[in-house]
Amino acid sequence: MAKVRVYELAKEFGVESKAVLAKLQEMGEFVRSASSTVEAPVVRRLKEAFSQSSESTEGAKGGQEKKKPSPKPQPSPQQQTKASAPSAGGETPRPAVPKPGPGLKPGPRPVPKPGPRPGPRPEGGAGKAGQQPSGAQGPARPESGKTPRPVPKPGPRPGNNPFSSTASGMGTRPTPRPPASGGTGAPRPGPRPHPGMMPPRPGASAGGPPRPQAPRPQAPRPGPGTAGGRPGSSAGGPPRPVPRPGPRPSPMNMPASRPTPPGGARPSTSSRSGGGRGRGGGGGAGPRGGGAGGGAPRTGFGGRPGGGRGRGGTAGAFGRPGGRPSRSRKSKKQRRQELKDMQAPSFGGVKIPSGNGKVIRLSRGASLADFGERIDVNPASLVQVVMTQLGEMVTATQSLPDETLQLLGEELNYTVEVVSPEDEDRELLESFSIEFGEDIGSEEDLKPRAPVVTVMGHVDHGKTRLLDAIRNTNVASGEAGGITQHIGAYQVTTTVDGEERKITFIDTPGHEAFTAMRARGAQATDIAVLVVAADDGVKPQTAEAIDHAKAADVPIVVAVNKIDLPTADPQKVRAQLTEYGLVAEEYGGNVQFVDISAKENLNIDQLLEAIILTADAELDLKANPDMPAQGLAIEAYLDRGRGSMATVLVQRGTLRVGDSIVCGDAYGRVRAMLDENGNRVKEAEPSRPVQVLGLTNVPSAGDSFLVVKDDRVARQIAQQREARERFAQQAKASRRVTLDNWQKTLEEGQREELLLIIKGDMSGSVEALEESLLKIDPGTDEVAIRVIGRGVGAITQNDINLAASSGAVIIGFNVRPEGKNSELAERMGVDIRYYSVIYQAIEEVEAALKGMLKPEYEEVQLGTAEIREIFKVPRVGNVAGAVVRSGVIKRNAKARLIRDGVVVSDNLTVESLRRFKDDVTEVREGFECGIGIGYNDIRVEDIIETFEMREKPRD
């Protein structure tokens, strides 16, 4: 239970806070202010004390009411005349109005006692009781001949409305403040009211509705001299003028009003007995009869005279609802949650509920805000936990690596699962009710499709030459350096057993830098053709291609190339491939080997036949051509005239011109499609490679593409993919900065970095070049490579501006600057390097890294001299007379003093060097000289050795 504050107790008791503070001090409890908290036992004692005091107060009030005397006798006319004198000069407080008894019956009733008058009243001029001025009203006196009914005289009640005077007919006169209990005091008149600020009298305002009153019988008119009338008025005088209403008063100045109960007089609800503010009597049935008899109770704080509700009862006070605070019981769920929070483990002062092994799925690059949202915890608390428990400095919105999220989950007893990119993309597509990777429809909807064949192997083993022989083209002659540096896709038609069959070939690079391309080609293929040179045998990239094919679970057909060379040995190749699990059919295996010569065009038809037989025997290649197209982006690049272009392989469905397509983080509408020969096509069926125009940007090679119903869905999917990939890259690039490696991180921040901006003609080439450059090992931590920009297409002005501001080097791979950007780069001093072969770029960047290394120095001995004599020179010190034993002694060279083979002093300098009386710069072997080294503790036969530090090349 929460502790209660003093002001809350005061509100509950209906008293002021200082009264509660005083009571606590009487009880011996020390509290500082009304905002201090009070313990539960003290609250109980305080409630008992206040309940006892309230009972005693009520008993005292009851006794006082019993001891109240009867109404005083009416004063004599002389006393009334004397009493009227001070009222003429100023406002004199008048006595309280007698409180009428309950349920007045028709008949003779007591008339109000006339109060002091300003002058003698004319005879016969008595008005109605409801029309008498408030200042001339006193206790009621019975009519002559009638027995008056005793009415207890209530005590005076103080009025808090300064605008209650009726001297000018604008309201009632202020009521005098009652004296303190047990004593008497002179009444103090209130301030004179301003006529414009006086509230209109109820029932007398022009246009105001009359106050509802119960009908009462008319009281007999008092006789002459028995009731106070209006000064200067008589029975036959003119009627009393109705006061004109002033301006609308402020609600704070309005007197509180309540509906008049039957009987005309309103009962007082004050906490202590007191009369009303108006004149008494409850007159006749006139418009003001009895209107002010009871007076309106003051709305004040509890415990004060005239107070209504308790302290804080005003609605809206301090932003709280009106009335006393309610203490409702907490539900079981709230109590259970509080108990759970109390039992939650604390991490560095932060309580976080335990996960109890609950599994939390987070995407790549998630932040603490994402984690906190999943477990319903404030991210600021998680930041504190990471800093105190894991020792890492992070922010709530920073993308975190997967291992950091998993470590945090272990600390909080959660099992964190980082969603893989494949699952992430599948969940994204499922949110749009899209299924990727499966054919839609029944078995009857599936139709045969052409096999997709990937040609793989080591560099320079003849892969592209083989495709040229199959297509009767000469692609290899146009490639830079004679090597393939991007993926090419082609579809050819061959005749097998008199039937035309289509085969789609994918040519992959064989250079070691294109590992990702070979893996991508193997994933998109049905059959892998492994090309091995008969004169070279199995090489590293050959073994890597075998691993990719086995990982993709595709059958392999081996083409032993270059059998026309005199050094060719096909049997040796078969024996080597046996070690990798590829056993030829003639050796009892299930792998087909075909000996070919791509250059001489030998046995090419046999290779195509072997591919078709393998596809028919081991694979059931079918697809639904009627569904929306899905497939894979093999390559992508930026064309100057056509914009973003992507070479895609349709795997399912049919791609048509005008379809809305999304490929990775790129989207658009298919404007045109081209085949491998540059001819326009209107649709592409399964296993057909085409070039697509119309994408918003260049996608990454290897991204999947699919056709959606409209451009809006394509845009949403592409934007969400881009955002997720960006978060993943941020998490990958962020380095874990812990308290343990803080100093090391600061030192790494001071190391040299080679900043690069890579621009290439193909997306796959840029990817391969970046991966190869980041793998360069300079052999030290002093330098590093950081790629700050990459892209496909010509070198733009934005690339040059970025390089100029960051000091980066631009690498153009088969691209050039557009327009006058080359001149801009020269003016801004930006270094642009152009390459057409990937290994040339790798070699030069590696050389540049080594050139950035800090130089290393080695010590080289110059010469030695033996001391023969010691000379004392004034203001200089001891000077050695020596003979040069070896090498050369040079002035300002570094020196050390050696005595009996032990270094006596190091870090000395040859300050002076003389040959006889001449200053010289050096003295060679065999000559005598005077040497001053600035060191006086020298002895005969000491050796002076001179040396210098020379820079040595870094390996």
Swiss-Prot record:
Which residues does the annotated region (G2) include?
A: 482-486
The keyword Cytoplasm is assigned to this record: yes
Please state where this protein is localized.
Cytoplasm
Q: Which domain of life is it from?
A: Bacteria
Q: Where is the composition biased (Low complexity)?
A: 77-88
Q: Where is the composition biased (Pro residues)?
A: 95-121, 149-159, 188-202, 209-223, 238-264
Main localization is cytoplasm
Q: Which UniProt keywords apply?
A: Cytoplasm, GTP-binding, Initiation factor, Nucleotide-binding, Protein biosynthesis
Name the residue ranges with Basic residues bias.
326-335
| Listed InterPro entries | EF-G-like_DII (IPR053905), IF2_II (IPR044145), IF2_N (IPR006847), P-loop_NTPase (IPR027417), Small_GTP-bd (IPR005225), T_Tr_GTP-bd_dom (IPR000795), TF_IF2_bacterial-like (IPR000178), TIF_IF2 (IPR015760)
Q: Which family does it belong to?
A: Belongs to the TRAFAC class translation factor GTPase superfamily. Classic translation factor GTPase family. IF-2 subfamily.
Known role: One of the essential components for the initiation of protein synthesis. Protects formylmethionyl-tRNA from spontaneous hydrolysis and promotes its binding to the 30S ribosomal subunits. Also involved in the hydrolysis of GTP during the formation of the 70S ribosomal complex.
Q: What is this protein called?
A: Translation initiation factor IF-2
